[in-house]
């Protein structure tokens, strides 16, 4: 059971519902989604650095929007302050991932990839493929034929890896010899492939994908709970 004085870092749209159902605090909700916290939470989720997510969480828990405002002298000064938190949270902090965040990843990455100095963002998404045939050699999907031996899609796009996932854990990871390419994540339930995700390298390496989808996390920073 989660201790009563805990706080949950999750995406804002469940903020009110979580607090109403559990009495636990959240970092942002429907009333605070436009605060600077939302940018940093999104940045931590889509980023590939576990340390940065840890530091963002620590800073938001101890300094919040006031600390952001006080250090918003320049983009460099603000990021430096967030990456070097000076205080430890008194209460336990939980990262609360939900499956629907996968579909919202585009919106999250649009916010989290915002260039706070020059403006503009580079959102990424999980692309879902509708596949109806699977053999050891190839997959046939709507608009795509995937060579599982050489790592090509329609003989043009390259695959860097294929990852088989069940219950949030990696069963198998098959790597190809391509320096660049996309990742195919096959979500398995029982013995059946129930979801096929095509993602770029940034999404694959994001903290959200590594921790929630693949069950990979830094054990010196995080502890998994159910």
Go through each PLM region and give its residues.
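Extracytoplasmic
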Residues: 1-226
């Amino acid at each position: 059971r989660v201790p009563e004085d805990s706080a949950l870092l999750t995406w804002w749209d469940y903020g009110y519902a979580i607090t109403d159902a559990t009495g636990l605090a959240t970092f942002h909700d429907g009333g605070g989604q436009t605060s600077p916290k939302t940018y940093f939470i999104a940045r931590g989720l889509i980023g590939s650095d576990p340390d940065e997510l840890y530091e963002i969480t620590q800073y938001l828990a101890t300094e919040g929007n006031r600390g952001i405002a006080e250090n918003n002298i320049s983009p460099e000064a603000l990021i430096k302050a967030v990456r070097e938190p000076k205080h430890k949270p008194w209460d336990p902090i939980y990262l609360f991932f939900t499956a629907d965040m996968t579909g919202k990843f585009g919106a999250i990455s649009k916010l989290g990839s915002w260039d706070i100095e020059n403006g503009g963002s580079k959102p990424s998404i999980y692309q879902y493929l509708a596949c109806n045939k699977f053999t050891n050699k190839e997959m046939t999907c709507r608009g795509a034929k995937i060579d599982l031996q050489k790592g090509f899609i329609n003989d043009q796009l390259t695959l860097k890896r294929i990852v088989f996932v069940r219950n949030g854990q990696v069963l198998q990871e098959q790597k190809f010899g391509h320096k660049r390419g996309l990742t195919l994540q096959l979500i398995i339930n029982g013995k059946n492939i129930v979801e096929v995700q095509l993602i770029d390298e940034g999404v694959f390496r994001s903290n959200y994908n590594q921790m929630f989808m693949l069950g990979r996390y830094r054990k010196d920073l995080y502890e998994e709970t159910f």
